[in-house]
C-alpha cells in the first residue's frame, strides 16, 4: 500500500483507528500512504471512479459497499494473515481472527483471512441494574427476531458474552449472564 491512495475512514472514526493499527503492524504509517478520510459510501464511489486504490472497511461480511463493488467493478480482498495478523492480535487484544468464507462476494473464490472487532453496547456505570438487565435480556431473549431483520443478528451469542476484556461489565448485564451460566468481569470481581 506504500504510496497508494487509501481510504482510512473518517478522521477519528473507528475505521480510522483500526486502519492505524493495521498500518502500524505492517510497519507503515499514514505518511507512507496517500490517506483519504472517507465514509464507506464515499470509499465505494471513489473505488468505482478509480480515485483511490484501496479502502479499509470495518463492517460485517457481507457488507453492502463491498457487495456492490464486487458486482459492478470487481474487488480484491486482501488477507490479513500470518505474522501480520499475529502481531495485530498480540498488540491489540480487542481484535479477533476471522475468515470471510469463499463466495461471500462475487468473484471471491477463496477464503480470506482477516481480523474483526466485536460490536459492544456500552452503558453508563451509574445506570440502574434493573435497566441494564432488561436491556441485556431484550437483546439476547430476542436474538432470533433480530436475526430475521439483519443477518448479523445470527452472530449474537450468550456464549461469546465474556469475550470482551479490559472493560468491566455492568452489574445488570452480569446478572443476566450469570442466570445463563456465563461469568463476566465486573468492578466487583
Describe these PLM feature segments.
Residues 42, 49, 59-77, 84-94, ...:
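An extracytoplasmic/periplasmic, membrane-proximal ligand-sensing/linker region
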Residues 11-21, 94-165:
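Ligand-binding clefts/hinges and TM-proximal coupling segments of bilobed small-molecule sensing domains
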Residues 30-122, 127:
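Pocket-lining segment of extracytoplasmic ligand-binding domains
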Residues 1-49, 163, 167-172:
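Bilobed "Venus flytrap"/periplasmic-binding protein-like clamshell domains
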Residues 3, 26, 47, 55-56, ...:
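Broad hydrophobic/π-residue packing in well-ordered secondary structure
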Amino acid at each position: 500500500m506504500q504510496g497508494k491512495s487509501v481510504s482510512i475512514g473518517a478522521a477519528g472514526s473507528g475505521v480510522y483507528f483500526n486502519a492505524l493499527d493495521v498500518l502500524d503492524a505492517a510497519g507503515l504509517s499514514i505518511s507512507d500512504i496517500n490517506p483519504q478520510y472517507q465514509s464507506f459510501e464515499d470509499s465505494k464511489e471513489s473505488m468505482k471512479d478509480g480515485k483511490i486504490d484501496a479502502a479499509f472497511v470495518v463492517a460485517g461480511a457481507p457488507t453492502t459497499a463491498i457487495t456492490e463493488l464486487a458486482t459492478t467493478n470487481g474487488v480484491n480482498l486482501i488477507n490479513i494473515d500470518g505474522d501480520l495478523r499475529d502481531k495485530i492480535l498480540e498488540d491489540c487484544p480487542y481484535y479477533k481472527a476471522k475468515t470471510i468464507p469463499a463466495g461471500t462476494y462475487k468473484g471471491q473464490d477463496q477464503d480470506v483471512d482477516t481480523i474483526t472487532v466485536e460490536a459492544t453496547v456500552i452503558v453508563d456505570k451509574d445506570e440502574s441494574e434493573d435497566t441494564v438487565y432488561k436491556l441485556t435480556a431484550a437483546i439476547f431473549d430476542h436474538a432470533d427476531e433480530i436475526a430475521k431483520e439483519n443477518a448479523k443478528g445470527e452472530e449474537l451469542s450468550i456464549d461469546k458474552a465474556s469475550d470482551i476484556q479490559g472493560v468491566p461489565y455492568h452489574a445488570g448485564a452480569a446478572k443476566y449472564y450469570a442466570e445463563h451460566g456465563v461469568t463476566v468481569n465486573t468492578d466487583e470481581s
